Design a protein with these regions (language model features):
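Short aromatic-rich membrane-water interface segments that cap or initiate transmembrane helices
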Residues: 47-48, 140-152
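Membrane-interface loops
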Residues: 23-37
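Internal, non-catalytic "lid/hinge" segments that mediate substrate recognition, gating
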Residues: 107-108, 118-132
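Membrane-interface helix termini and inter-helical loops of multi-pass transporters
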Residues: 100, 131-145
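Hydrophobic alpha-helical hairpins/lids featuring a short glycine-rich hinge
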Residues: 71-73, 77-108, 112-113
Length: 320
C-alpha cells in the first residue's frame, strides 16, 4: 500500500515538474490549439493555448512504471500501458495533423476509427493469448460471470474499447473537465486492482491520480495548456484497458457514466437534427456546451460533472 501512495506522489511531482518545463517549450514551438468554427464563440480567446499537454502525465506514468520494474511480479500492467500509448499515438497523429492544417480537424473519423480498432484487436488478442484476461463477462452487483466464445468476446470488446476511448475524448471540451472526471475513475481502478491483489496493475492508475492532480494546476480555468487528443485518447485507453485487465468491462457503464452521457448527447443531437430537419434537442452538444449556453461557468460544469463521476465510481465500488 505504501508503494501505491508513493507512486501517486511521485506521479504528481513528475507531472508537475514536466509541465513547468513542457509548457514554455510548446509555446516556443507554437504548438497551439485551433478553435472549431462551429464551436462556442466564447472559446475563441483560447486559440493558441498550447496543446499536447497530456505528455506531462503520460511521461510521468511511464517513468514511474519503469522505476517500479525491479519490484514487479506481474507485468500485465505494461499491456495496459502499451495499449494506452498506442491510443495516445493516434491522438498525437491527430494533433499533428491539426497543427499542419492550422485548424481543429485532424485525422478523418474513419482513419481514427480504423487505427483504434486495430490497436484494440491487438491488445485483446495478446491479453487473451497470454492468459492475462478472461473471456467471461462479469455482471456488476450480481457477482456472476457469463462465459462468451473468445471470438464473440474479442469482437464485442473491440467496439466497447473504441467507444470508450472516443467518449473520453469527447469529454475534453472544457478547461479541466476530462481530467477532473477521470480522476475518480483512476482512484476506483487503483482500489479495484488492490482489492483483486493486483498491486502491480494498480501502479498505473495510481500514478495517474497524482499526474492528473498536477495537470489540473495547469489546466484549470483559464487553462495554460490543453491535453490534446494525445492526452485524452491516452486516458481513454487507460480507462478501458484497466476495465478489461481487471475482467470487469461492464463496470464502464458506471465509472464511465459521464463519458457515456457526453457521447449520447452528441448522438441524440445529430439524430434529432436530421429527423426534424434542423431542430436541436440541446442548445449545443456535447452536453457540457449545452450547460455553458445555459449560463454555467466552466468551473461549475467541471465541479458538477466530476462530482457525478465520483458518485458513480462509489456506486461501481459497491457493485464489485
Amino acid at each position: 500500500m505504501t508503494r501505491i501512495l508513493v507512486t501517486a506522489l511521485v506521479g504528481a511531482v513528475l507531472s508537475g515538474g514536466l509541465g513547468y518545463l513542457l509548457i514554455p517549450m510548446l509555446r516556443a514551438l507554437k504548438v497551439g490549439q485551433s478553435i472549431r468554427e462551429v464551436g462556442p464563440i466564447w472559446h475563441n480567446y483560447k486559440a493558441g493555448t498550447p496543446m499536447m499537454g497530456g505528455l506531462m502525465f503520460i511521461a510521468a506514468s511511464i517513468i514511474v512504471l519503469l522505476c517500479n520494474l525491479p519490484f514487479m511480479a506481474d507485468y500485465s500492467v505494461f499491456y495496459v500501458l502499451i495499449l494506452s500509448l498506442c491510443f495516445g499515438f493516434v491522438g498525437f497523429l491527430d494533433d499533428y495533423a491539426k497543427l499542419r492544417k492550422k485548424q481543429n480537424e485532424g485525422l478523418t473519423s474513419i482513419q481514427k476509427f480504423l487505427l483504434q480498432l486495430a490497436v484494440s484487436a491487438l491488445f485483446l488478442y495478446i491479453m487473451y493469448r497470454s492468459g492475462a484476461m478472461s473471456t467471461e463477462m462479469y455482471i456488476p452487483f450480481f457477482g456472476i460471470s457469463i462465459p462468451l466464445h473468445p471470438i464473440v468476446y474479442i469482437f464485442l470488446s473491440m467496439f466497447i474499447m473504441v467507444g470508450c476511448d472516443n467518449a473520453v475524448n469527447i469529454t475534453d471540451g472544457v478547461d479541466g473537465l476530462s481530467s477532473s472526471v477521470t480522476l475518480p475513475v483512476m482512484v476506483f481502478f487503483t482500489a479495484a486492482a488492490i482489492k483483486q491483489g493486483k498491486y502491480d496493475l494498480a501502479l498505473l492508475p495510481a500514478s495517474l491520480v497524482g499526474g492528473l492532480i498536477a495537470y489540473l494546476f495547469y489546466n484549470w480555468h483559464p487553462a495554460k495548456v490543453f491535453m490534446g487528443d494525445t492526452g485524452s485518447l491516452f486516458l481513454g485507453g487507460v480507462v478501458c484497458a484497466l476495465a478489461f485487465a481487471l475482467d470487469m468491462p461492464l463496470i464502464l457503464i458506471f465509472v464511465g457514466f459521464v463519458y457515456i452521457c457526453e457521447t449520447v448527447s452528441v448522438i441524440l443531437q445529430v439524430g434529432y437534427f436530421k429527423l426534424t430537419h434542423g431542430k436541436r434537442l440541446f442548445k449545443m452538444a456535447p452536453i457540457h456546451h449545452h450547460f455553458e449556453k445555459c449560463g454555467w461557468k466552466e468551473e461549475k460544469i467541471v465541479i458538477v460533472f466530476a462530482a457525478v463521476s465520483a458518485v458513480m465510481c462509489i456506486l461501481a465500488w459497491l457493485g464489485i
